[in-house]
Swiss-Prot record:
Motif Nuclear localization signal: chain residues: 16-33
Gene field: CTNNBL1
Main location: nucleus
Chain segments annotated as coiled-coil in the UniProt record: 476-540
Organism of derivation: Bos taurus (Bovine)
UniProt-recorded name of the protein: Beta-catenin-like protein 1
Motif Nuclear export signal (NES) positions after renumbering to this chain: 130-140
Subcellular location: Nucleus
Superkingdom to which the source organism belongs: Eukaryota
Length: 563
């Protein structure tokens, strides 16, 4: 290595961390040349530094002058220049590989070629500004060559490749050229990019800042590709990413940006994906999530970022509980006990714990969890939350409506699934203290009935205007209106009316009389409640088998006979 090489050095255009001065630039060059061999060849490096220091002023003048000339003479990026760049990359990659094979124990022999390889990788960042030319990366086999370098012996090279791939797959860039994005994504998926990235992740040391950045950029590649092509999430999880994410989450390391990013990517992989949910369960992922969340049962997150990670983990857990097999794992892992404890501790985690319990107990698959919840004295926890919505919930981003929605859904699930002694214990709660819980139920009923009636009036006005303009109200528009009504409060109201029907069919005269008494006092009618429950029954069972849908509708409508 000589002064000529230093003169020919081009700044790292792709790096996200600009260097402050020439001295820092030289240090970075030495690190990229061979971090792992630094100890053995420190003497040679010192010689280079001395040469640089001797000619520092002259070097800076020449570099500044050449930089100005380059700006003036720089050619616009086109197919020809990209092809030339890719050819240079292939040559330098091959040369470095050849020298490493020829001189495996003499880094000074291949150090220069590694510098050259790193330089051209940095120059290739400019291709990310022209996604229309991505097809050249595929046609000239550059993508496969880049993927091959993910396993390079020098992690500095693999990190440089990861940084480049992250920029090439930036979601905003991908949307600029759908065709170019498709070609690049196909090539990356065909080359099993995630499997190679995971292998690279396994050897990175996050105590080294550059390698920690490499981990972050790797996760960004996965996020970018998952957003552009959601179906690749299943393959990504099966190629070892899900297992690595779980391992990284439970690693005994201080909270950092990478742990937050891991929680985000995990939530993405599990979204609407039963295969990944099942795989997580098989990898003991439910236990990992519960262990990580247990930290927040008595302590609030210390930062906004840590709170975001906590919410991501809760979202992942809720997503997994959509699968019945994971509800069994949740039960065995004492997830109910943890969530119940969080409800009692009144920390920030309480709102999310309530959502988890809702997911764990809903539907016939939640029967075992419902019974266990009563056994661990969960009724003592849930009914105070039913009687009064906490004042502090707005501070943690949860609305009063969301809180009441989850509580009412849990009570509806308990009434649906409980049998025997546990059901009796639940019904007795509605007779305590002069039926105060029935009074609260009716208070919520009128609150949400009013909200839904306001929404219905607005929707009817919109329908009238559409008819007047000659527009057709098709099924899609009707579905949209129904979703708006659900969001306005119909979803909560349906659960409230279902609870009313269940407790009035419980052969407890005191409860039934109180419900009818309050309805009459408010000038309301059983007909309104029946209409709401019928509408609820008609729309139940979405995504389930026709047999379940039919039997559930019959069961719900049967409740109206004795209401």
């Amino acid at each position: 290595m000589d002064v000529g090489e230093l003169l020919s050095y081009q700044p790292n255009r792709g790096t996200k961390r600009p260097r402050d001065d020439e001295e820092e630039e030289l240090k970075m060059r030495r690190r990229q040349a061979g971090t792992r061999e630094r100890g053995r060849y420190r003497e040679e490096e010192m010689t280079v530094v001395e040469e640089a220091d001797d000619d520092k002023k002259r070097l800076l003048q020449i570099i500044d002058r050449e930089g100005e000339e380059e700006e003036e003479e720089e050619e616009p990026l086109d197919e020809s220049s990209v092809k030339k760049m890719i050819l240079t990359f292939e040559k330098r990659s091959y040369k470095n590989q050849e020298l490493r094979i020829k001189f495996p124990d003499n880094p000074e022999k291949f150090m220069e070629s590694e510098l050259d390889l790193n330089d051209i990788i940095q120059e290739m960042h400019v291709v990310a500004t022209m996604p229309d030319l991505y097809h050249l990366l595929v046609e000239l086999n550059a993508v496969q060559s880049l993927l091959g370098l993910l396993g390079h012996d020098n992690t500095d090279v693999s990190i440089a490749v990861v940084d480049l791939l992250q920029e090439l797959t930036d979601i905003d860039t991908l949307h600029e050229s759908e065709e170019g994005a498709e070609v690049l994504t196909d090539a990356l998926v065909d080359g099993q990019v995630v499997a190679l990235l995971v292998q690279d992740l396994e050897r990175l040391d996050e105590s080294v800042k550059e390698e920690a950045d490499g981990v972050h950029n790797t996760l960004a590649i996965v996020e970018n590709m998952a957003e552009f092509r959601p179906e690749m999430c299943t393959e990504a999880a099966q190629q070892g990413l899900l297992q690595w994410l779980l391992k990284r989450l439970k690693a005994k390391m201080p909270f950092d940006a990478n742990k937050l990013y891991c929680s985000e990517v995990l939530a993405i992989l599990l979204q609407d994906n039963d295969e990944n949910r099942e795989l997580l369960g098989e990898l003991d992922g439910i236990d990992v999530l519960l262990q990580q969340l247990s930290v927040f049962k008595r302590h609030n997150p210390s930062t906004a970022e840590e709170q975001e990670m906590m919410e991501n983990l809760f979202d992942s857990l809720c997503s997994c509980l959509m699968l019945s097999s994971n509800r069994e794992r949740f039960l065995k892992g004492e997830g109910l006990q943890l969530m119940n404890l969080m409800l009692r501790e009144k920390k920030i985690s309480r709102s999310s714990a309530l959502k988890v319990l809702d997911h764990a107990m809903i539907g016939p698959e939640g029967t075992d969890n419902c019974h266990k919840f009563v056994d661990i004295l969960g009724l003592r926890t849930i009914f105070p939350l039913f009687m009064k919505s906490p004042r502090k919930i707005k501070k943690v981003g949860t609305t009063e409506k969301e809180h009441e929605e989850h509580v009412c859904s849990i009570l509806a699930s308990l009434l649906r699934n409980l049998r025997g002694q546990q059901r009796t214990r639940l019904l007795n709660k509605f007779t305590e203290n002069d039926s105060e819980k029935v009074d609260r139920l009716m208070e919520l009923h009128f609150k949400y009935l009013d909200a839904v009636q306001v929404a219905d009036k607005k929707i009817e006005g919109e329908k009238h205007d559409m008819v007047r303009r000659g527009e057709i109200i098709d099924n899609d528009i009707e579905d949209e209106f129904y979703l708006r009504r659900l969001d306005a409060g119909l979803f909560v109201l349906q659960h409230i009316c279902y609870i009313m029907a269940e407790i009035c069919n419980a052969n407890v005269p005191q409860i039934r009389q109180r419900v009818h008494q309050i309805l009459n006092m408010r000038g309301s009618s059983i007909k309104i409640v029946r209409h709401i429950i019928k509408e609820y029954a008609e729309n139940i069972g979405d995504g389930r088998s026709p047999e379940f849908r039919e039997s559930e509708q019959k069961r719900i409508l049967a409740l109206l006979e004795n209401f």
